[in-house]
A protein has these predicted regions:
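Domain-wide signal for the mature, well-folded portions of proteins, strongly enriched
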Residues: 492, 560, 581, 608-609, ...
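Elongated alpha-helical scaffolds that mediate protein-protein interactions in large eukaryotic proteins
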Residues: 1-34, 38-75, 79-121, 129-146, ...
Length: 822
């Protein structure tokens, strides 16, 4: 700790004891705690407490107050815990009898102040800071502190209860790891003292008649097995297995969700399947006796573990598939029914009852569809999942939701009434439908899939969020259809024609969300299918390109931005790509570029301008702008617009455009193998000077938005590395053009001011002179600039001394520093 910090600390703590400060902002206290958590402040020796007796004096003074403020008491507990986190400082505080009074069972927990949740929260946080060494654990066990933590697990304050729960988990893990770094064997049950007390508490709670005690213990075990599932947790499970099994047999309703969470965490690890304690039997029993809603998470955990036994895996899969099987049965006549399952794990009437209830039907189907989405691409489940029947059931759900299916059973009629227009189920089903497009076995039902997708796209009742999901699923199926080896071109053209007809209507929707999602769908399709002849033919024969161009003038900025992106992809498809039917149409190219440049310079909103600069960068990257001379003029023109833009993301996009232009030179092959590399590099420097890019790059170094400055600095560092692969700053400062040095020194001085260099002047350096720019790149310390730009915005004031001064300034004891360091 610095001398100045030591000098100010007594005044800070004297201020905190002033009763007039009871209403001040708690941020002062948080800042002071931050001070003591700085590595330089929290010295792991006696030095901090010995050099600053005001610390122990403050702790003693607070304990001596007849009615201390709860917030000051909470702060005191946390401060004491931070100090006691060092073993040496812990021993000194123990000798002073301060820890017993603060953290012992007969200390603060036995006082009237304990009734305030702020004090209890501070106590738990203080203990959390303290338990970093074995003596602290022994202290808590011997003074009754651990019993206080057990009690706080059921604190009326959820924050306190949660913190106490997490503290117990950390204490158990820490006590075992420092006492026995090597793995336990099943025969070695000699737990350390702290672990013994926590484990006994768990065992006693599991045998308790109190539902809350049982839930807390199960919650504790769940957190333990979530963080550790090999080694000693196996030993812990052996001692708990029978009690867990008896809880399951008793069918305690309150404990069932926690039991499922516990077993789910254990089921993700293969070690428990091989361990003693009948884990497999317990999992099977839970899968059989609980409803699909309750057992679903456990079933998914079992299925995700590739080493789970086959019989348990099949039961788990049956639990997940049962609701989908019931949907197929509800939609079909008995003789037509081709289900997913040969037999059920639990009573089928249970699932039918859940699907017949308005309160449970939607939640069950959403949960089931979510689980299926997570399981579809698990390689070890490929042989178990009936993909075709699964796809059929998903399509059936979507037909139920929009009323396009006439149910063939009373159950189907009930489900149909519940699901009609259920957007939650529609969105979940469309997510799964899109993923199923990647499964080869599902290709046989392509016609049925597009029937339902087109029905959703055409229906005026499809709300915008569902329409977006429909577009996504349609896009996935169209991409897969185009890549299918035996695809029928006539079928593809028919589907594409229907899609573009619907898209024409959606692009004219009065709802901006619909227009926006339609444009995003078009952009995605065009990006991935522009090389396909059927796609280009269907696109160009529709009104979609014209309508898309019209939306560049949409009143909603989000729509204009999406229209820019879509027009960018359409331009590649229509004008730039060599295989385009209208490739080479110079007038159309120039017209499109001019429209986008106008948006970049005149649109009042940032989103469309960002979209334009992203589109231009993509065109340049793909080589669609033309020869190098054209690209140079294009980049220069765009950057002269971008450098004055008020949106920092547009300016950042401009830097990405410059980087792409630089990469053209970096990747450009030499015309002659004997051509010196310096000629190639000089050509790049000259092009950057002609295009006025250096002015933009150096100006960006002083940008008031840090990401822009950092990006410019990285780009200039990369440029210099390309020019001078073995560059050293010392060598560069000994060479160079002496007459130009004053202007370079001025430039470096300006750059050091960073964003404080207002109205970056351009008359001090000739940014269009190649020699001056080469000298600047060789001389300026970009590493230093990069380091400064990498500092956080508060690095100057976020120091122990500054924090202490800020606290004193806040309470009016000094006036020199009134800056809030946060």
């Amino acid at each position: 700790m610095s001398r100045e910090c030591c000098r100010l600390l007594p005044r800070v703590f004297a201020t905190l004891l002033d009763p007039r400060l009871s209403g001040s902002d708690d941020t002062c206290l948080e800042k002071l705690l931050d001070c003591f958590q700085f590595p330089a402040m929290n010295d792991l020796s006696l030095k901090l407490l010995q050099d600053n007796p005001c610390l122990t004096e403050f702790l003693t003074s607070v304990l001596a107050l007849p009615e201390p403020s709860p917030r000051i008491l909470s702060f005191t507990l946390r401060l004491a815990g931070i100090l006691a986190g060092s073993e040496n400082q812990f021993q000194l505080l123990l000798q002073e009898k301060l820890l017993d009074r603060l953290f012992g069972q007969e200390g603060l927990p036995n006082s009237t102040a304990w009734g305030d949740a702020t004090v209890r929260s501070g106590w738990v946080k203080g203990v959390h800071h303290m338990v970093c060494h074995q003596p602290a654990l022994h202290f808590l066990c011997s003074t009754g502190g651990i019993d206080v933590i057990f009690t706080l697990q059921e604190d009326p304050s959820l924050f306190v209860a949660s913190a106490a729960h997490q503290l117990l988990v950390n204490m158990l893990i820490f006590s075992i790891e420092i006492a026995a770094p090597n793995p336990f064997s099943t025969k070695d049950l000699d737990w350390p003292e702290c672990a013994q007390m926590i484990i006994k508490h768990i065992e006693d709670s599991l045998q308790s008649s109190s539902a809350s005690h049982i839930k807390q213990s199960l919650k504790l075990l769940t957190a333990l097995f979530e963080r550790h599932n090999t080694g000693w947790p196996e030993v812990l499970w052996l001692g708990m297995a029978k009690q867990i099994e008896s809880l399951l047999m008793e069918k305690t309703p309150e404990a069932q969700p926690m039991l499922v969470d516990l077993l789910s965490n254990m089921a993700r690890s293969p070690v428990f399947y091989d361990a003693e304690g009948n884990f497999q039997g317990l999992v099977s029993s839970v899968l059989e006796h609980l409803t699909p809603v309750q057992a679903g998470p456990l079933a998914v955990a079992v299925l995700k573990c590739c080493r789970s036994p086959q019989d348990v895996k099949i039961k788990a899969l049956t639990v997940v598939l049962q609701p989908m099987d019931c949907i197929l049965r509800a939609a079909s006549q008995p003789l037509e029914y081709t289900g997913l399952l040969d037999e059920s794990v639990s009573d089928p009437t249970t699932v039918e009852s859940l699907l017949s209830s308005k309160s449970s039907c939607v939640s069950l189907l959403c949960q089931t569809l979510s689980h299926l989405e997570n399981l579809l691409f698990q390689n070890h489940l490929e042989m178990y999942l009936p993909y075709t029947s699964l796809l059929h059931s998903v399509v059936t759900i979507l037909q139920f939701c929009n009323g396009f299916l006439t149910p063939a059973s009373p159950l189907g009629s009930t489900i149909s009434r519940i699901l009609i227009s259920s957007s939650r189920v529609q969105r979940s089903a469309l997510d799964v439908l899109g993923k199923l497009s990647e499964i080869k076995a599902c290709e046989t039902l392509t016609g049925s899939v597009f029937d339902v997708l087109l029905a959703y796209l055409e229906s005026p009742n499809t709300i915008s969020t569902v329409l977006t999901k429909t577009f996504q699923a349609t896009s996935m199926w169209l991409l897969c259809l185009q890549n299918q080896s035996g695809s029928n071109s006539q079928q593809i053209e028919k589907i594409l024609k229907a899609v573009f007809l619907v898209l024409q209507k959606r692009l004219c929707s009065p709802w901006w969300e619909v227009r926006d999602s339609s444009l995003e769908f078009l952009a995605h399709l065009t990006e991935h299918l522009r090389d396909k002849e059927e796609f280009r033919k269907s696109l160009l024969s529709s009104e979609v390109p014209r309508l898309t161009e019209n939306l560049l003038e949409d009143p909603e900025s989000y729509v204009r931005a999406s229209a820019v992106t879509a027009v960018g992809h359409l331009a590649i498809c229509n004008y730039f790509a060599p295989e385009s039917p209208v490739a080479g149409n110079q007038h159309n190219k120039e017209n499109t570029v001019a429209k986008l440049e106008e948006i970049l310079s005149t649109d009042p909103e940032g989103f469309p301008r960002r979209a334009v600069i992203s589109t231009f960068t993509e065109w340049l990257r793909r080589g669609y702008i033309g020869p190098l001379e054209d690209a140079e003029k294009f980049v220069s023109r765009v950057i002269q617009t971008v450098e004055h833009d008020l949106d920092w993301e547009v300016r950042l996009g401009g830097l990405k455009l410059v980087k792409t232009f630089f990469e053209i030179f970096f990747k450009k092959p030499k015309a002659d193998i004997s051509e010196p590399s310096t000629i190639h590099q000089d050509e790049c420097v000259q092009a950057f000077c002609r295009a006025k890019l250096f002015s933009f790059l150096f100006q960006s170094l002083c940008d008031c938005d840090k990401p822009v400055g950092q990006s410019a600095c990285h780009l200039l560092l990369g440029f210099r590395s390309w020019l001078y692969p073995f560059h050293t700053l010392e060598a560069s400062q000994r060479t160079g053009d002496a007459p130009a040095r004053p202007s370079i020194a001025w430039l470096q001085s300006t750059l050091r001011q960073g964003s404080l260099a207002q109205n970056f002047p351009t008359d001090g350096v000739d940014f269009q002179d190649p020699k001056t720019m080469v000298l600047a790149l060789d001389t300026i310390n970009f590493e230093e600039l990069n380091s400064e730009l990498s500092n956080s915005s508060d690095y100057v004031v976020k120091s122990p001394l500054s924090l202490i001064q800020d606290i004193l300034a806040t309470v009016g004891t000094i006036e020199e520093n009134e800056v809030d360091c946060y």
